[in-house]
């Protein structure tokens, strides 16, 4: 879904892009007036934010860390199983990766990938201040 631009690069440029992407955080935490908000690409594969974050700082050879990285990038278990339990330790967790017709909440997990890569709308979420918790979609 949209990765053709990367494959068109020569090896050295692909390595440069990979190096830049490797320097990005796996997850983001934002302290808000309502509590801690987590942001991750796909999901955390469980319901324990602190445990997820703790496992991410382990050595790269650690199998648990590898599993957490895999979940952060690819996991769809929660949305495919329509599990609505909250992620402990967070006010809300915002995720993407799985296109949904409109922003969708399962417990305190909010799915905001509304398929812009496929020509559908792009969704933004307000996590602080007036309008916090609201999502806004706009045609791509």
Kindly give the residue locations of the regions a language model identified.
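Active-site neighborhood of divalent metal-dependent phosphoester bond hydrolases
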Residues: 1-29, 34-36, 60, 64-70, ...
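Short, well-ordered beta-strand micro-motif
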Residues: 29, 39-41, 124-128
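Short catalytic/ligand-binding loop motif for oxyanion handling, primarily in non-cytosolic enzymes
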Residues: 38-39, 46-49, 101-104, 119
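Short, surface-exposed beta-edge/turn micro-motifs
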Residues: 35-37, 90-91
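Active-site-proximal beta-strand elements of phosphoester/diester hydrolases
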Residues: 37-43, 110-112
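Conserved beta-sheet core of the metallophosphoesterase superfamily
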Residues: 77-139
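Active-site-proximal segments of metal-dependent phosphoesterases and phosphodiesterases across multiple
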Residues: 44-87
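Generic secondary-structure microfeatures
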Residues: 25, 32, 41-48, 98
């Amino acid at each position: 879904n949209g990765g053709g631009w990367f494959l068109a690069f020569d090896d050295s440029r692909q390595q440069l892009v990979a190096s830049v992407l490797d320097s990005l955080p796996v997850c983001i935490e934002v302290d808000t007036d309502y509590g801690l908000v987590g942001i991750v690409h796909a999901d955390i594969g469980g319901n324990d934010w602190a445990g997820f974050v703790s496992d991410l700082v382990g050595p790269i050879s650690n199998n648990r860390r590898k599993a957490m990285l895999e979940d952060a990038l690819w996991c769809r278990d929660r949305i495919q199983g329509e599990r609505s339990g909250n992620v402990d330790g967070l006010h809300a967790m915002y995720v993407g990766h799985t296109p949904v017709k409109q922003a969708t909440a399962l417990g305190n997990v909010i799915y905001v990938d509304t398929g812009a890569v496929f020509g559908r709308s792009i969704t933004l979420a307000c996590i602080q201040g007036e309008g916090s918790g609201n999502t806004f979609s706009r045609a791509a």
